[in-house]
A protein has these predicted regions:
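Short, low-complexity disordered leader/linker segments with a strong preference
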Residues: 1-42, 73
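Beta-alpha junction/loop-to-helix N-cap segments that form part of ligand/metal-binding clefts
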Residues: 28-31, 56-62, 74-146, 211-215, ...
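Extracytoplasmic "Venus flytrap"
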Residues: 35-63, 87-94, 116-117, 182-191, ...
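Periplasmic-binding protein-like
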Residues: 103-116, 136-138, 178-183, 229-239, ...
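Hydrophobic alpha-helical
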Residues: 118-129, 220, 232-252
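An alpha-beta-alpha
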Residues: 152-213, 232, 326
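Extracellular/periplasmic periplasmic-binding protein-like sensory domains
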Residues: 249-320
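Segments of small-molecule ligand-sensing domains
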Residues: 307-316, 327-347
Length: 347
């Protein structure tokens, strides 16, 4: 990644490899679940490998596959090799639900890793629960997503956490007394971060503007912002629009810090913004390649670089972590229900 880009402020120093899953509330399945096969353990991948947010899904697929390869090379789980059934949900919520049904009823997987986004995860979980198969999303951040869902696990922080961290960072580190809030109004993810930011920020929000996913021309809103007195722009949203916003803002001479959530994460954001304009940018990341990491995280970094000849994003790291969580929970398990129970006990 080009170093002109002011890399992430890291809310968590590094991904906690083999960390605990997200909170699990009430709710249950009447299904017995899928049995673990005699010679293999089937795990389904349900990732956004094409479509609007393919950068997230393809990164997660790579991280997840790396974990599978390492586990299998080390002898598998209880001597059984992991068999991956990899499906593309095309960045569509309906397809994520359909893929889940296929994985649990046709492929008979014992666990699912993915989707990446909150919307797709919310669409997928009902079909997984009905079949008694646990689903872990490496990166779904929507608050309350696990409420009432015994079969859903989350591998990252929530939107409300991100909004508070952004507020703290712009106030304490950037000394921003006045900000502009520019939110993707079509995204529950973005709206969740914006809501938490508004509640936590003690300074003045001098403008509260919105855009919609798929927009490409942001000059009208940016022109309005340019006439304001502010110290930073907060952009809750995904890289697909945020990168273009950075590009156009810098092209108009707006050089104030631009701050976002984990949706900025990845090389694709820099490609959208262009390297020469992607400066003075800050975003949250659960993993960073530029800070000191643990021995386990370094082993992941080295292996990922060797396999793919590129830097891993936080999405790759979280998916790698998620597969290890599933593998650990599958030890000694006879069916998907027992894998779910073991995931729920993970600390």
């Amino acid at each position: 990644m080009k170093k002109k880009f002011a890399l992430s402020f890291v809310a968590l120093a590094s991904v906690a490899l083999l960390a605990a899953c997200g909170e699990v509330k009430s709710g249950a399945s009447n299904a017995a679940g899928n049995s673990v096969e005699e010679k293999t353990i089937k795990i389904g991948f349900n990732f956004e490998e094409t479509g609007a947010v393919a950068a997230y899904g393809t990164s997660e697929q790579k991280g997840a596959q790396l974990a599978v390869d390492e586990i299998n090379a080390a002898g598998g789980i209880d001597g059984k090799q992991i068999e991956v059934v990899d499906k593309d949900n095309k960045s569509e919520t309906a397809e994520a639900a359909s893929v889940t049904t296929n994985l649990v009823t046709q492929s008979k997987v014992s666990a699912i890793v993915g989707p990446a986004t909150s919307g797709a995860t919310a669409a997928a979980v009902a079909n997984a629960t009905k079949a008694g198969v646990p689903l872990i999303s490496p990166s779904a951040t929507q608050d309350g997503l696990t409420k009432g869902q015994d079969y859903l696990f989350i591998g990252t922080f929530q939107d409300s956490f991100q909004g508070k961290i952004i507020s703290n960072y712009v106030s304490d580190k950037l000394q921003a007394k006045k900000v502009v809030l520019y939110t993707d109004n079509a995204s529950d993810y973005a709206k969740g971060i914006a809501k938490a930011f508004r509640e936590a920020y003690k300074g003045e929000i001098v403008a509260d503007e919105t855009f919609v996913a798929g927009d490409t021309d942001f000059q009208a809103a940016l022109t309005k912002m340019k006439g304001k007195d502010f110290d930073a722009i907060i952009v809750p949203g995904y890289y697909t629009e945020a990168g273009k916003i950075v590009n156009q803002a810098r092209g108009m001479g707006i050089d104030k810090p631009i701050v976002g959530g984990d949706g900025f994460n990845g090389e694709e954001f820099v490609q959208q913004a262009t390297a020469e304009k992607a400066s003075n940018i800050y975003f949250i990341s659960g993993f960073s390649t530029t800070v000191e990491v643990s021995a386990k995280a370094k082993a992941f970094l080295d292996a990922y670089r060797a396999k793919y000849n590129e830097e891993p994003s936080t999405f790759a790291a979280l998916a790698y972590d998620s597969v290890h969580l599933v593998a650990n929970a599958a030890k000694g398990a006879k069916n998907s229900g027992e894998i779910k129970d073991n995931l729920a006990k993970t600390k």
